[in-house]
Amino acid sequence: MDTIANLITSIRNAYIVDKKIVRVTATRTNENIGRILLQEGFIKSIREHKDGQKSFLIFTLKYRKKKEKRITLKRISKPGRKIYSDFPNMPKVLGGMGIAIVSTSRGIMTDREARQKKIGGEILCYVW
């Protein structure tokens, strides 16, 4: 089960049907990706919710202007085909307008942070 793909699909589908919140399974990876989306201003808030023994993350979506109201998320590295990049060849999403979320040896971070720290890693997804 690919929890990152589930997270991306849930957020994408919620934007399509104008939902305000998205509930996904709480994993450390999903929490870190959510933290990055929150820092970069793509979502409004994140909170954790426990339902019995299961934990969920609840994302409150942020809508932009009426014309351009949804963000685009694209899964890059998949379980069947991992995509890695070293820091000099780290891709710039839309010429720097978007971000790449990268899993490195020092945790999950944006492409900008990875370039500053001069480390490469697995490119999880693009967000713009």
Swiss-Prot record:
Q: Keywords in UniProt for this one?
A: Chloroplast, Plastid, Ribonucleoprotein, Ribosomal protein, RNA-binding, rRNA-binding
Signal peptide stretch: none
BP GO terms, sorted:
translation
Gene3D superfamilies, per the entry: 3.30.1370.30, 3.30.1490.10
Q: Which GO terms describe its cellular component?
A: chloroplast; ribonucleoprotein complex; ribosome
Q: Name one GO molecular function term.
A: rRNA binding
Q: Which residues cross the membrane?
A: none
Pfam families, A to Z: Ribosomal_S8
Spell out the subcellular localization from the entry: Plastid, Chloroplast
Role according to the record = One of the primary rRNA binding proteins, it binds directly to 16S rRNA central domain where it helps coordinate assembly of the platform of the 30S subunit.
Which family does the entry's similarity section mention?
Belongs to the universal ribosomal protein uS8 family.
Q: How does it assemble?
A: Part of the 30S ribosomal subunit.
Q: What is this protein called?
A: Small ribosomal subunit protein uS8c
Q: Which gene encodes it?
A: rps8
